[in-house]
């Protein structure tokens, strides 16, 4: 900039959560897991609920990893300075200035988030472009000039960091930087940021080039201290930085040096005149056309956030160019309850002269008050000043240092500088002497008669008005409201001034100023002031507040030719343009969504047509089968089955059997079917949320510590992480094949062969750092059944339901085998036999006598609903119907067009239980006509008569003598006392106990089940175990909804022996323990009395 353009300076909004409702829902839905309690529920479920309502991917809730090792005080300071950032302290590396480095990282993210944009361009003055690239900030352009060797070394370090990122991450890094100065770069952007990089650039230059580059707002962080305006040196505590000013005589400049105490090789020097501009400037006017508002918005442990905001216009007013002379309070937070005390410090010890430097010391207001009061109490005219100064110095010493007695801090203060110790004591002595001298005049002043506002009111409450003859005559002469004083007042004020009388002047309501007046003294003072002799007079203003030069009232003006802002500044035009662009973008987005949806619907209709051909018998040849070898139909069908575009309308258009119900006729079981659809969708949402939370925990990147993978299995041992770059699974290889995996972009289809990912799939997923899977990724049956459930809603069923209700072990499955008609030669259509689980289906295929070609009609209800086309039958036999949601039973019966449904089950055993504790079901039980007239269905061949008295609610059921052995109670202290045995089923009520036993080496994991999972199975020997001493509703059988059904399932799985291993053998609330103890008290005759012989 030339001399003509030098600047001149002149002094001038989640829905609120109801915690009571959360607790109430938890208490009413508590189930088998005894580790669940109120604190865990509030800590996990409520936290998930809050996170689901808050966008944590951007803005104030971003997680920031800080690897520097910090002290607890430094960590607390970072959290206090940046409350909107979720900071994770890793303590993985050490630095001599760790807090300053960590603070700089937090400043960068904090200032970047203040702009609230990821699309608008941002200029970073001297920014670390590698850090921006790693964080995915593609909208940041960094101006990184090389001004000295330190800047060049920074580029080397950034290059090394960038090379490591390219090698490890294998993904695009949005690097955007230049080596030009801010004044020379031509990149334009509406926003700019500077992290400790503008301390050497005059504020007028910054404002000028902000106009040239189209910057509307600049936010910078500057290391400053308000005491720089007062002292020559100081210290910033947490940053551990010493600063010192130095006057350079050759250049006439004042430099300020910053020295990091623990980093001797790290120091900075700036021109103090330039740095101080950011302390005291309120406004910068450029070319009398543009105006920047300068604000210091926050003080963060010695780092001030300075904002320069360009003023917009209304198109006709120039009020935004008016200099603003208000007072900034930027420093007041640091100077609160502080005062400046005047003192004189000797700077020479020569015999012929004594030179004193008069300056101010910053002290606590409470300390000044305490010492000044004590000094006045000890003051005496009989004592010499030296002795009194010693007394005051002693009080200063004890009051300004920490006093600790028995480990308790009784007084805390700030130490006084060595050269200010005695001069401060002299100042307090002068204050005490001056106050002592003012006692006599004060006595005269307080005795002076004065008037209050109430004294000038008359009896009616009106102000008394004295008649002034002179003012009345002047009004008659034509003057308007003359206000000459009364003649008596003039006599009082000027009459005896030369003889020491006083005058009284009213300053404000009920406040009067009493001034002694002496004509002779006033004349002498006037003569002395004319000749400049008053400069040596005494000044007792020894304590003052914040100096005026620290209150930021400066306005800068700068002029540069050919300068114009590149965009519009009219607020009306800018707002209108923004809204118009937003509407156009919304319309374009809507058109694109409509086009994508139309494409998906057309694709799904075509794929459903092909699917019917794929489901045909492979022995039947037609023209569609060769398509499988020509294109990727199977992959497309897999993608289509997971698509939400498979609506019932799409199925209706491809299957002629699905005829719409006419008029108001709908499926009478719609409530149950819709509840099943809603449940499966909620389970899918929960699975997706859990997998995403695991990925977010890893940061969707490869962790440096391999033990992090083990931590993921804390609550779910099925979690696995696949790293494409290493082609390796963590923490261990999978035991199953997965059909999908969660990535940072969502689910990804994962074709596997022999538990290994195919080469083609590996190439496609190489762009991801890692993939996360768990048991929900093996096979997602719920989402595959939804199209069938939705299709069933459109049909009107004609079947009737008969429920064959039998106790555990009474032979319900045997009865089903007898009445099943699956032979193709049977009269009418063969039966359809469905089960709730695969083990029951495999068992029925073995025991039901039918040709192999007809065994496809014996299957699970899930597999039937997942068919692309459903075969029909006249009768549906359903085994263990209460283990499946009633909506699936009704939908299968509707799609099979059956006329009769015979459902086998036990109403006293465990019903269908939701995996989601917060999901409440109302229509999950199959309803129909109860039938248990068959004699042998009223007798249990598996359950001892003892348990009939305690568990079975059916009054007409009986037990068989065949099960004559008693149950055995086995007290244990630890899980390791349970030994692995062959042909034994291990059962427990809670999943936590199951996971604990599965960790024991040698235990058969396939034979360890919960009572809910073991329902419907029969074993000769059963071991029931309990590893928690806390009794829950499952052990006591006092649940309001389930009752003792879990205990009934537990004791009805064995034929020969039942052993109960428990850590709480004396728990009287445990229903099984209570029954076993009761059995021990009975004789064989007592047991025979209740047995029924066959």
Curated annotation (Swiss-Prot):
One of its GO terms (cellular component) is membrane. Its EC number is 3.6.4.-, 2.1.1.-. The keyword DNA-binding does not apply. Keywords: ATP-binding, Helicase, Host endoplasmic reticulum, Host membrane, Hydrolase, Membrane, Methyltransferase, Nucleotide-binding, Transferase. It is a peripheral membrane protein. InterPro entries: (+)RNA_virus_helicase_core_dom, Alphavirus-like_MT_dom, P-loop_NTPase. The keyword Nucleotide-binding applies. Gene3D superfamilies: P-loop containing nucleotide triphosphate hydrolases. It comes from the Viruses. ATP binds at residues 806-813. Residues 938-1093 form the (+)RNA virus helicase C-terminal domain. GO terms for biological process: methylation; mRNA modification; RNA processing. Residues 777-937 form the (+)RNA virus helicase ATP-binding domain. Residues 88-279 form the Alphavirus-like MT domain. GO terms for molecular function: ATP binding; helicase activity; hydrolase activity; mRNA methyltransferase activity; RNA binding. Residues 802-1062 are annotated as: ATP-dependent helicase. Residues 68-409 are annotated as: Methyltransferase. Involved in the virus replication. Contains a helicase domain and a methyltransferase domain. The methyltransferase domain is probably involved in viral RNA capping. Involved in the formation of ER membrane spherular invaginations in which RNA replication complexes form. Belongs to the bromoviridae replication protein 1a family. This is Replication protein 1a. It comes from Tobacco streak virus (strain WC) (TSV).
